Regions:
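Conserved C-terminal beta-signal and adjacent last beta-strands/turns
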Residues: 2, 368-370, 374-381, 422, ...
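Extracytoplasmic beta-strand/coil segments of soluble accessory domains associated
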Residues: 29, 45, 77, 81-122, ...
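Outer-membrane beta-barrel translocator/receptor signature
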Residues: 113-114, 124-128, 137-146, 151-237, ...
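Outer-membrane beta-barrel domain signature, strongest for Gram-negative TonB-dependent receptors
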Residues: 232-378, 386, 536
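Membrane-embedded beta-barrel scaffold of Gram-negative outer-membrane proteins
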Residues: 308-340, 488-491, 496, 514-580, ...
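Gram-negative outer-membrane beta-barrel transporters
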Residues: 375-379, 428, 438, 539, ...
Length: 743
């Protein structure tokens, strides 16, 4: 065992010695206006059934609706800042979208993501749909599962899952209205109403959100003076209907819709490799302006609409057997225009006015059986999905400035899977084995992908298809040392789908790439106890991942049919590696009314073997999407005032992320996004004078830190690098009114 492995394993042993615990993101705190003394149980659905977070042998960060509001989590970066081992990378286009990366497992260019997102147990068919602004209203909870999830969910994931669960209709009338006013002319409103149409038989819930906010990046001209980028303009709603016609039968149908119409992301030139005097002058002018003022030659915009209808129908035959079916249909269209080089020079841009730039239709179906046979709880099921993606992209390219060409690509991805997983409680065999449980699961997956691409700039039409079949497994064993302390060990195996590159010839040896595989070993402890009279909760996980057929994108030159070459992106699977780390989440109530939550992640990753055919990868190439250190501290103090005046809480959090590589190869001299730290503050007054009214003042990025959240690197092909930056200091006022029976 290496020194680092001893260090990681030792973290779990140290926690065992402490025999106390906490869980940072997932804590809900029960309190009165004058005291906060206990940490409340948190219910999660990580194993497709409701369980106490502390009894699940998986590293999980969970958020209640109040925590999402208190920490002002409104986009992917906000969520990542509050979750260890999760980061969000934004490319700049489409402006509101971004990818989640858990434990270094994320998306590669034109390939499947290693981290999957779900809404109401249905997969997100497109990278970045869930988590964008407008996703966080009227949720029941939000969970981030870390580590391979290969045997219980519809899609196979090597990094983890992000689960969005909406509020379902209940059998009581009620709801809420919430409004927000802030700087940059921010205006936001959320609301929901719950209507029991027929008592405990027909239940309806309607929720909606809308926001308008000016952008914080301004165009100085000469083409579009005064146009603001990074603005927000979206609206959405959900309609949920729950039917319970007979005992044991439930049918939940949800329709949701969201549309957005913005001016796009305000990307900023970061580096220039061109020797063109005009481009050098444009870059120098941008450097003098700073990152909040830009000059584009392409009229940017970002328009999208998204709709989904899903149904969950279950029938409980008895306490030991339930059958459940989940079906969904999703449609999404995007139209966007984007200035790749972010300058007033005609270098490279992309635009589509007459047709969607991207779009898809997606269908998923899952049949599930849940049951219990004495001491064995099991879940078995079948899953299938179909994703059809017609994509049209008009753009000006560096090798043909001033000429608009159309890239037309159609893809079809299908998968079918069968899975089974069971948990056995050995305490049923003998009292001596009480507290000992084991979980085993297996999933067999068959995937098929096909694509047709027309790329006029290289004068060719290419098509191809590929099929894959593989199995994934899970084995966990956990033991309760005490009723409040559990230790566990797990071994999990998962795959990420392979595919092919339509931009290169079959004879190149780069047209096909196999599935990516990760085998993960994990040790953990979860404990909720008292330490010197203080309520504590600690969750620690140490993991060791063996990574095979690592998918990385690289730049290659192909014949353009005009006597020259053109650079294109391809995905290659040419390396092995390891990803090891420790995750800590803890909560502490040192005095009545004061809650301190801490989370931290340390990650160490490296390539262990690289194929001689690898492009731009060596053993020394840094892993992308993996900051070595990442953490946050949140402190909330509820003032000891009489409850008839309400509850007043002052809270603040500090978050930190070390530098992170966003380059998948060493083909660029600009691989790193710098480290950053943030401070956020909030003052809440809930139940004002005993009324169902609340108010809050908030400020995010209090120190006005300028930090990058994404990068597009065309230095090798076109001589420029651009970056996307997070919002500056934001502040505002929130008001909330709840109606219906008191809770």
């Amino acid at each position: 065992m290496t020194f680092k492995h001893r260090y990681l394993a030792g973290a779990c042993l140290a926690a065992l010695a402490l025999s106390c615990g906490g869980e940072a993101g997932a804590q809900a705190v029960s309190s009165t206006a004058s005291a906060q003394t206990t940490l409340q149980e948190v219910v999660v659905t990580a194993r497709r059934r409701s369980e106490d977070l502390q009894s699940v042998p998986i590293s999980i960060t969970a958020f209640t609706p109040k925590q999402l509001t208190d920490r002002h989590i409104t986009n992917q970066v906000d969520l990542a800042n509050n979750t260890p081992s999760l980061i969000a990378i934004q490319s700049g286009y489409p402006g509101e979208y971004g990818g989640f990366i858990v434990r270094g497992q994320g998306p590669a260019y034109n390939a499947t993501s290693g981290t999957e997102t779900y809404f109401a147990e249905t997969p997100d068919p497109y990278l970045g749909l869930e988590g964008r602004p407008g996703s966080y209203y009227d949720l029941a909870n939000l969970e981030v599962l870390k580590g391979p999830q290969g045997t219980l969910f519809g899609k196979n994931s090597t990094g983890g899952n992000v689960l969005f669960e909406p509020q379902r209709p209940t059998n009581s009338y009620g709801g809420y209205l919430e409004g927000q006013l802030g700087n940059y002319n921010d205006r936001q409103a959320d609301g929901a109403v719950n209507l029991p149409i027929v008592d405990d038989k027909v239940l309806l819930r309607v929720a909606g959100t809308v926001e308008r906010r000016d952008g914080y990046t301004t165009d100085v001209g000469p083409y579009f003076p005064g146009r603001d980028y990074d603005n927000l303009s979206y609206e959405g709603f959900r309609i949920g209907l729950l039917l319970k016609p007979v005992e044991g039968l439930e049918s939940y149908t949800l329709y949701r819709y969201q549309q957005s119409d913005t001016n796009g992301a305000g990307t900023v030139p970061y580096a220039n490799e061109s020797t063109s005097p005009a481009r050098i002058a444009a870059f120098d002018a941008q450097a003098a302006r700073g990152v909040r003022d830009v000059s584009y030659d392409t009229l940017e915009f970002n328009k999208s609409f998204y709709s989904q209808v899903l149904n969950q129908t279950s029938y409980r035959f008895n306490d030991a057997l339930t059958v459940k079916n989940i079906v969904s249909f999703t449609r999404d269209y995007l139209a966007y225009s984007y200035d790749y080089d972010a300058s007033p020079i005609n270098v490279a841009g992309q635009s589509s006015y007459a047709m969607p730039t991207q779009g898809f239709d997606y269908i998923s179906e899952e049949l599930q059986l849940q049951g219990k046979i004495q001491s064995l709880q099991y879940t078995a099921g079948l899953f299938g999905d179909n994703l059809y993606t017609p994509e049209y992209e008009g753009f000006n390219y560096i090798t043909a400035p001033g000429h608009t060409v159309l890239l037309d690509q159609m893809t079809n991805d299908r998968s079918h899977a069968g899975f089974v997983q069971g948990t056995y409680d050995f305490g049923g065999l003998s009292p001596v084995l009480s507290g000992l449980s084991a979980t085993a699961g297996y999933r067999e997956t068959a995937e098929y992908t096909s694509s047709l691409s027309a790329v006029p700039i290289v004068h060719k039409v290419t098509a191809g298809s590929a099929a894959f079949q593989y199995g994934s497994y899970t084995f966990d064993i956990d033991y309760k040392l005490t009723p409040n302390t559990m230790i566990y060990a797990s071994l999990r195996d998962a795959y990420k789908a392979g595919g092919f590159n339509t931009t290169v010839a079959a004879s190149s040896g780069l047209s096909f790439y196999p599935p990516e595989k990760l085998v993960n070993k994990e040790l953990g402890i979860k404990s909720t106890n008292e330490l010197w009279g203080m309520q504590t909760r600690v969750d620690i996980a140490a993991y060791f991942g063996d990574y095979d057929n690592i998918q990385r994108q690289a730049l290659v030159n192909v014949d353009n049919g005009m006597g020259g070459t053109v650079p294109v992106q391809v995905v290659q699977s040419v390396a092995k590696g390891r990803v090891d780390g420790v995750e800590f989440e803890g909560s502490l109530i040192p005095i009545s009314g004061l809650v301190i939550t801490v989370n931290y992640a340390y990650t160490d990753a490296a390539y262990t073997q690289v194929s001689p055919n690898a492009i731009g990868i060596t053993l020394a190439t840094p892993f992308p999407g993996l900051p070595q250190n990442k953490g946050s501290i949140n402190t909330a103090y509820t003032f000891p005032i009489n409850s008839e005046y309400g509850r007043v809480t002052l809270s603040g959090d500090v978050t930190y992320q070390s530098k992170v590589s966003v380059a998948t190869t060493n083909q660029t001299p600009y691989p790193w996004l710098p480290a950053y730290g943030l401070l956020n503050l909030r003052l809440d007054w809930d139940h004002i004078f005993g009324r169902p009214i609340g108010a809050a003042l908030f400020a995010t990025n209090v120190t006005n830190k300028t930090y990058a959240t994404g990068q597009l690197d065309f230095s090798a092909s076109s001589g420029f690098v651009t970056r996307t930056y997070a919002p500056p200091r934001m502040f505002g006022l929130q008001l909330r009114y709840a109606f219906g029976p008191p809770h």
